[in-house]
């Protein structure tokens, strides 16, 4: 069944992100390549709590939400003329896939954010918002209320805090944000996954291309080079320098460090944050829809990790990054498509 889920994710990526009908085989293979790389490179994370437990709790919901947004795009926003029976079936599938997806707390935050950004986009573009969207918003809000008020979740936090991380009880909102932001940025800076490195490289290349190869835009490749530098330190076994910047297992956040180390890591964090934001700004100037979409996906990926600072279980053996990694896969796939599209036009 997991094989079917992974295959479905690859197909849905191709269906959702490309409008190129000339070479569907290439784009399907590209999607399969990214999903296959994910399985190979993160099999240890998938096995950390048991393969079946991890895939059903993390991977299956991703498949469900891709199905949900594919149907939303193809049948709700395009308002296709179909029979009432087929429309009823689609509505039912939309509701079921949404409920299955938001059973995951991380995806609940991401899907809620996705719908918020969708509504903002529709209002800005003066696109009529389908009435069904309001039903989905209500479902999401009820799930938020349930997750935050459920006695079981409240007791679980108390038990995990007491047994696993007593210091968490003294964390204020600044500490929690600090921990979440540090986990996100340190993971990227230390090249803990291949897809973030690919994203930074593709983002720099695409920005350089659309800016008519303006030399100043070469700076957009700096984050990728910085990340590759730390990756080379790890493979060359220069553990002293690498360990100095590696804060991916730091439970108390960046603010708990000494001033010099905090400043050093903070500067690197600014580099891998501000320069990609500059790239996205240039993309937005060239193609507002694409720039907005990339920005939204990055915010959703960021949100999926930052909420780890609001739970005493913290990193959970890397599983907190699984949703973020699929955001990176989507962005990598999209940027490859846009770079090829740009080359074909020019």
Model region roles, listed by residue range:
Residues 1, 52, 106-113, 120-123, ...:
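Transmembrane catalytic cores of multi-pass membrane glycosyltransferases
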Residues 3-29, 67:
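Transmembrane-helix motifs of polytopic, lipid-linked glycan transferases
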Residues 11, 67-74, 114-122, 202-207, ...:
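Transmembrane alpha-helices and membrane-interface helical segments
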Residues 22-32, 83-90, 128-136, 214-225, ...:
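Membrane-interfacial loop-to-transmembrane alpha-helix junctions, especially the N-terminal start
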Residues 29-30, 34-73, 258-278, 302-332:
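Membrane-interface micro-motifs in multi-pass membrane enzymes
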Residues 74-98, 134-135, 344-345:
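Short hydrophobic alpha-helices at membrane interfaces in multi-pass membrane enzymes
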Residues 85-111, 141-142:
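Membrane-interface alpha helices of multi-pass inner-membrane proteins
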Residues 221-224, 271-298, 340-346:
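Signature aromatic-anchored transmembrane alpha helix within multi-pass, membrane-resident enzymes
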């Amino acid at each position: 069944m997991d094989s079917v889920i992974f295959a479905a994710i690859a197909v849905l990526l191709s269906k959702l992100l490309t409008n190129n009908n000339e070479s569907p085989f290439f784009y399907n293979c590209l999607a399969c390549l990214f999903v296959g790389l994910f399985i190979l490179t993160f099999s240890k994370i998938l096995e950390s709590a048991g393969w079946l437990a991890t895939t059903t709790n993390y991977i299956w919901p991703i498949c469900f939400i891709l199905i949900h947004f594919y149907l939303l795009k193809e049948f709700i926003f395009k308002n296709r003329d179909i029979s009432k029976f087929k429309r009823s079936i689609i509505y039912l599938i939309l509701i079921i896939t949404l409920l299955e997806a938001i059973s995951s707390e991380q995806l609940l935050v991401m899907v809620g954010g996705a719908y918020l950004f969708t509504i903002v986009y529709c209002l800005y573009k003066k696109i009529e918002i389908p009435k069904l969207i309001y039903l989905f918003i209500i479902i999401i809000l009820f799930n938020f209320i349930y997750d935050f008020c459920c006695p079981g979740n409240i007791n679980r936090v108390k038990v995990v805090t007491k047994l696993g991380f007593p210091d968490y009880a003294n964390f204020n909102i600044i500490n929690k944000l600090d921990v979440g932001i540090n986990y996100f940025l340190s993971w990227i800076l230390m090249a803990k996954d291949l897809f973030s490195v690919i994203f930074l490289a593709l983002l720099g290349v695409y920005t350089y291309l659309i800016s008519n190869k303006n030399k100043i835009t070469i700076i957009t490749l700096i984050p990728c080079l910085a990340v590759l530098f730390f990756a080379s330190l790890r493979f060359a076994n220069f553990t002293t320098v690498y360990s100095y910047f590696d804060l991916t297992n730091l439970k108390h956040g960046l603010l708990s460090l000494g001033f010099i180390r905090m400043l050093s890591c903070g500067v690197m964090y600014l580099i891998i944050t501000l320069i990609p934001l500059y790239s996205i700004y240039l993309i937005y100037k060239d193609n507002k829809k694409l720039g907005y979409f990339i920005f939204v996906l990055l915010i959703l990926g960021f949100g999926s990790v930052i909420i780890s600072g609001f739970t005493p279980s913290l990193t959970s053996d890397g599983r907190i990054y699984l949703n973020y990694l699929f955001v990176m896969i989507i962005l990598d796939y999209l940027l490859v498509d846009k770079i090829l599209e740009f080359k074909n036009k020019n």
